[in-house]
C-alpha cells in the first residue's frame, strides 16, 4: 500500500544516521499506521548538487523537494514494505540516492 503525506510532520535531524526523518502514514489504514521515513543527507544533496553539501543544505533541499521525497518513499514502501529495522517500535524506511533518482 502506498504512503500518504503528513504535512504537519516537521523534519527532524537524525545525526547518528546522517539522515533527516519525518512521518508519513499507510494509505487507507484504520487506525492510522505511521511510518518513519529517513532520508540520507547524501540523497538530499544529490537533488541539487549546486547546494552546499552539509546539514543545512540537506534541510533546504528537503523543504524544496519534499513532494519528490514523499513520492519516492511511497513508491519504495509500496514495492518493498518497511525496513526490518524499526524506529521506536514503528515501521520505518530509509531512502538513499538510488531511491530518489529512480
Task: State each model region's role.
Residues 21-50:
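A short, structured beta-strand/loop element
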Residues 12-16, 39-41, 55:
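The feature marks short-to-medium sequence segments in extracytoplasmic or secretory-pathway proteins
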Residues 3, 50-102:
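Acidic, low-complexity intrinsically disordered segments
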Residues 1-32:
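Short, charged/polar N-terminal "headpieces" of proteins
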Amino acid at each position: 500500500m502506498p504512503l500518504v503525506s503528513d504535512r504537519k510532520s516537521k523534519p527532524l535531524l537524525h545525526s547518528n544516521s546522517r539522515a533527516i526523518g519525518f512521518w508519513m502514514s499507510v494509505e487507507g489504514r484504520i487506525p492510522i499506521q505511521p511510518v518513519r521515513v529517513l532520508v540520507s543527507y547524501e540523497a538530499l544533496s544529490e537533488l541539487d548538487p549546486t547546494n552546499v553539501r552539509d546539514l543545512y543544505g540537506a534541510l533546504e533541499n528537503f523543504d524544496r523537494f519534499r513532494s519528490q521525497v514523499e513520492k519516492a518513499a511511497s513508491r519504495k514502501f509500496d514495492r518493498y514494505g518497511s525496513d526490518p529495522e524499526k524506529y521506536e517500535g514503528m515501521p520505518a524506511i530509509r531512502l538513499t540516492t538510488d531511491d530518489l533518482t529512480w
